[in-house]
């Protein structure tokens, strides 16, 4: 392998991974926009859609290690394509929703598919393809792309709902999701990189056992649990709250978009601070400020 090829492979994987997270994160964080219109169409309370959204997120958590294992065994590209296909099917299904079973089933399927084209598969591919000296920066770039996807896609989807209606907008989003298939092939280059050939093999069971023996892993998992609860709660219910306050529909979309863009800024800034200050103290500060924000 030539020197230029070695340098090109990580770049292609980063581009592909960034595009995947940009689209998948944008789709995932837009579901709160559908809470009111879908609930009104089904003539149900908001509890049904909220419950389905909770299952959506739960399936992302359950599916992530499963797709991670598939990625290790069959390659990141193949694993992500499977996830993308599930996402496309779920969006078609949700566009034609007719009752409780279809709304719960479509969101559950979407969550499972999102795990396949989400952080577990993408970050694993990027981590394998880049040199250890550039790994943190590369992972930060890809994660920032995901948050940027929330910034550009959520308000765009809110306009689609206003113009075409919620059902047809989901139909259009299924075509947007299909674009991810192109970028999933970029992840296959991670298997050809020199970095991916180093290290020892480890089964999924062995990896899980080793992780849960680590105090830092358990504490970090609890932190992500709290973070996920906050972010999902806001993403699902903020647009409905905005509507209840008689504000224009687009305000909810742009409110979620601002969360995405400031997440990009915060990720970069606190990543910078994390190399210079105590990460534990920074996390405590972040969660403390978030708690105060909810009280206000």
What are the language-model segments listed below?
Residues 142-190:
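Helix-loop-helix hairpin linking two adjacent transmembrane segments in secondary transporters
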Residues 78-92, 281-295:
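Structural signature of the two symmetry-related core transmembrane helices
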Residues 31-35, 215-270:
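Extracytoplasmic gate region of multi-pass secondary transporters
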Residues 63-75, 267-278:
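Helix-to-loop junctions at the C-terminal end of transmembrane segments
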